[in-house]
């Protein structure tokens, strides 16, 4: 006979990975066309000059250049200017 009672199995012990959102390229950084600038949920940052908006609100560079973060009133936008 066993002298230890069987241990139960836990139903916890799992966790999902984070969604890896956030700013990927900061102001002043050089980028190439197609580089992801920001991954976000909704338009926290709006696309400015030479920046595209993906289906999941990802902002990406349309041209090679330098990233700038600008704000006009309450709206923050990201632009890329050729260097």
Swiss-Prot record:
GO terms for biological process: translation. The keyword rRNA-binding does not apply. One of its GO terms (cellular component) is cytosolic large ribosomal subunit. It comes from the Bacteria. Belongs to the bacterial ribosomal protein bL27 family. NCBIfam families: L27. This is Large ribosomal subunit protein bL27. It comes from Desulfosudis oleivorans (strain DSM 6200 / JCM 39069 / Hxd3) (Desulfococcus oleovorans).
